Amino acid sequence: EQFMGLMEKQSFDSDRKEVLDHALLTSWFTTDQCIRLMDFYRFDSEKKQLMKKIYPKIADKPNFYYAIDKLTFSSDKNEINAFIKQYHEKNN
């Protein structure tokens, strides 16, 4: 929760990106936390960037479809699903 508070304090996307990048070095995230982070972004293009960046550090990957469902367009959902498939093909 401290992390979310820190993210909320950041005025600029670039500052939020820096905080997130630092956290990704040492921390794992849940799908629920990813969904909450997605709320910081207005556009699906930004949300997709976040999802691709955070997915390797998601602790409950089987639940990630809940995050995917938050995207507006099926083409964006398909893109993230393809990314996840490719991720698992490369890392298994």
Residue ranges and their predicted role:
Residues 1-92:
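General marker for long, soluble alpha-helical cores
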